[in-house]
Amino acid sequence: MTIYPNLKKIMTKTQSTDFFIACKESRIENNTNFYGCFYLGPFDESLSQTLANDLRRTLLSELTGLAITSIEIEGVLHKFSTLTGMKEPVLDLICNLQNIVLRKETISSTNMNYRATKKTYIGFLSVNGPRVIKAADLKLPAGLQCVDPNQYIATLAEDGFLNMKFNINEGKNYIKQKPYNLDVTTLKKRNILLQNFKNKIGLTALKNKQLMSTTMEGKPLLSNSDNLRFKKSFKRMLTSPNQSLKNKTSLGHDTVSNPIPLDAVFMPVTKINCIIEENNVYSDFSTDPSLEFSTHLVPSLTTQTNLRQESTHKFVNKANSLLQENNLFRSEKVYLPNIYIPEGEGDALSLKGVSPYSDFKTFLSTLNYNSLYQTSLFLNQSLGQNKLLPWQANTLFFDVTNFADSQSNDVNMNMDLAGDKTSVQKIHSTGISNTDAQLNKLSLTKIKSFLGSSDKLQNKTYQSFLQPKYASSNLRTLLTQRSLQKNQSVFMHSFLDDQAKHKELTSNTLRANKFQVMKTVVSIPPKTFKTNPINTFHNQSLTFEYARKF
């Protein structure tokens, strides 16, 4: 078994060289079974299937092979006969001969017409029983050999023998032989000619007999001694028949034979599978300069209102220590994949009705899932962890990242229960300036919904992307702004039960001190992805998996 380790390197070079062909695996399973796996590409999604079918048909039709096309067995007139001393009938013998795989030592050209044959080779087989006949017993011409010498042919008893001559041809595809059936018109012509010949012979014999009768003289009678001598010799012949005459008669009966044509299949490869595998080597990361973010890459955003001053300092100090330990936030530039929402699709981000849950299907259909996954993979590699196992899950879950406006770095966004207003408030009492609450991890769930906080703040209301009349261009602007600084803080948050959270937010004592959270949770149907970025050559169904401690 041979495995090529440089296959992945060859596949990754497709960004500089368009076309590639590589052998992934090649092995010999047994004498008549060979396995090979090749990669060819890249092609468009619609073109690959068409090309694979054409390639399969071309390979099967252009390959040449060797096959036995006819046999001649001593004492056999047709394929439904039987041989004395042989276990199998002639029909089973023919089937075993058709399964014999032959090969040529020299490579022959494929310059041949459809269903045509080349030079004919003649082979022989002469075996006496008792014996098991195999392919190694065949007497093949020079340059030809059996792929499997242990191929079974027949079994002979003690009194059995098999004398056979067979023809071998090289060709393409297959040949279906025509049976030797005599036409009815040919039989009628033969009968008519035979009757005329008999009548003519009888007439000439009658004329000759009449002529001979006029001129023929009678023979003299034998003497008594001659009659006795003839009687003794005739009696000896009846009691002990001539052995040579018997041998001649039996030899003439056994040597009767007739060539039997066989349906030959010349294809050395009987099965070719073309499997289409997707490999998104071109869509790893986008290099669009408009999507260049400076310094920070935050997967999620959490906003705050008025925190108690004594708890704020502890949390900010902890967040600053996390930022200093995070190598990702020390980088100067980070390139994000393109996340585009068409015009008019931003209305799906708003809540409708009283329920805090809303359908997120419209917004889900507009996202580039592969770009989101590549972003998560890039974050994972930057943090020095590898927790993402995309081929073992059936759901996708992520947070819609909101980059605040650079002109107001300490802006907090909140959403009311009815979904008609969104409160944005600047922090005044915390003593923290230029600080946004951000969450450096993926929040994951299988609930296909849009979840928002169920409270109303008595503060100034601003237009934001969560309102129904929001334009998608503004959301795209928010997603592409460079607004985060190196020393910004990350605030962790926890979700409470819906009823308990509602009570806390409506109470007078806790209203000014609670987090206002906007989370988006979506679910992706199974088998959305067909690419494994870690091992791109496994034909597996890929989706997102939970990234713990991201």
Curated annotation (Swiss-Prot):
Its main location: plastid. GO terms for cellular component: chloroplast; DNA-directed RNA polymerase complex; mitochondrion. Changing S449T: In strain: CC-503. It is an enzyme of class 2 (transferase). Keywords: Chloroplast, DNA-directed RNA polymerase, Nucleotidyltransferase, Plastid, Transcription, Transferase. It catalyses: RNA(n) + a ribonucleoside 5'-triphosphate = RNA(n+1) + diphosphate. SMART domains: RPOLD. GO terms for molecular function: DNA-directed RNA polymerase activity; protein dimerization activity. Its EC number is 2.7.7.6. Belongs to the RNA polymerase alpha chain family. DNA-dependent RNA polymerase catalyzes the transcription of DNA into RNA using the four ribonucleoside triphosphates as substrates. This is DNA-directed RNA polymerase subunit alpha. It comes from Chlamydomonas reinhardtii (Chlamydomonas smithii). The gene is rpoA.
